[in-house]
């Protein structure tokens, strides 16, 4: 299965994925989400900054899901895995605060990151504010040229 992860542009995480500094993509939610139970080892995740085309892809080597989180469990996850998630040691406490009310977490371990020829995706039917899309084949939503799906 293929997935598209829409990233917060101001966090500048795509270069960290390419360099290997960010080895885990984490998703934190108050309720179960699109990615829950769908991301598996050997899947592919395509990454794009919000408002930009897809420019990076990576394989999935492992997935861990956590539910029924509280502030203590959130803190344990962030302190254990935050460094591999591209979070600097000086930012760990900020992220503990940011995620303290989240009830679900997915850790997606990335492998073989690479740049791809930039392409846009058609998010119609997925919700305009959606930050994660799971689809059997990326070509179903890949846009080439002026809004023509491949």
Predicted features, each with a name:
Residues 22, 41-43, 54-56, 104-106:
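A generic structural signal for short beta-strands and their flanking turns/coil linkers
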Residues 60-64:
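A short, sequence-level motif marking secondary-structure junctions
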Residues 13, 30-34, 52-53, 65-150:
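Contiguous surface segments at macromolecular interaction interfaces
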Residues 1-49:
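Long, hydrophobic N-terminal alpha-helical segment
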Residues 48-59:
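Short coil-to-beta-strand transition motifs
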């Amino acid at each position: 299965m293929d997935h598209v992860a829409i990233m917060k542009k101001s966090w500048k995480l795509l270069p960290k994925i390419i360099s290997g500094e960010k080895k885990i993509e984490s998703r934190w939610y108050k309720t179960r989400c699109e990615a829950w139970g769908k991301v598996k080892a050997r899947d592919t995740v395509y990454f794009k900054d919000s408002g930009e085309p897809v420019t990076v892809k990576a394989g999935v080597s492992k997935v861990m899901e956590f539910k029924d989180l509280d502030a203590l469990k959130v803190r344990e996850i962030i302190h254990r895995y935050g460094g591999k998630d591209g979070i600097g040691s000086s930012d760990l406490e900020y992220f503990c605060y940011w995620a303290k009310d989240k009830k679900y977490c997915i850790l997606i371990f990335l492998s073989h990151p690479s740049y791809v020829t930039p392409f846009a995706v058609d998010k119609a039917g997925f919700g305009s504010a959606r930050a994660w899309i799971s689809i059997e084949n990326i070509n179903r939503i890949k846009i080439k040229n002026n809004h023509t799906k491949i």
